[in-house]
Swiss-Prot record:
A GO CC term attached to the entry: ribosome
Record's subunit section: Part of the 30S ribosomal subunit.
Region of interest (Disordered), residue spans: 1-20
Claim: Ribonucleoprotein is one of the keywords in the record: yes
InterPro entries associated with the record: Ribosomal_uS10, Ribosomal_uS10_CS, Ribosomal_uS10_dom, Ribosomal_uS10_dom_sf
The protein's name: Small ribosomal subunit protein uS10
GO MF annotation list: structural constituent of ribosome; tRNA binding
Lineage: superkingdom: Bacteria
Gene Ontology biological process terms, A to Z: translation
Functional note: Involved in the binding of tRNA to the ribosomes.
SMART domains, sorted: Ribosomal_S10
Gene name linked to the record: rpsJ
Length: 121
């Protein structure tokens, strides 16, 4: 009997973990264009509001700034340089009380080119 109780407690804890995983997802969005990123976040929020799920965010994550320095002249002037910069904007959305309808609508959501979308379960 103790073995059965141990097995049942293990399975119930595993089921609880699975259920917890399915009730919350995290969506991470990245883009070089902050306006395009904000438009995508608004569309995702509209989908989540329609289906009745709860959400947190958008949580702005740190912007990654990359600077590239290039010599302007192909031959002599090493002192003459030009700098280019690329900023990667990031947002995090947490959706709680996830419903099947929400998942289906998010699957059909068309992501604009220039926005990277990752979903973490």
């Amino acid at each position: 009997m103790t073995e059965q109780k141990a097995k049942s407690s293990k399975t119930s804890s595993e089921e609880a973990k699975k259920q917890k995983e399915l009730t919350e997802i995290k969506i991470k969005l990245k883009s070089y264009d902050s306006r395009l990123l904000d438009q995508s976040v608004k569309k995702i929020f509209e989908i989540v509001k329609e289906t009745g799920s709860k959400f947190c965010g958008p949580i702005p994550l740190p912007t990654k700034k990359e600077v590239f320095t290039i010599i302007r002249s192909p031959h002599v002037d090493k002192a003459s340089r030009e700098q280019f910069e690329r900023r990667t904007h990031k947002r995090l959305i947490i959706i709680k009380n996830l419903k099947n309808e929400t998942i289906q609508k998010l699957k059909r959501f068309v992501i604009p080119s220039g926005v990277e979308l990752r979903i973490y379960l």
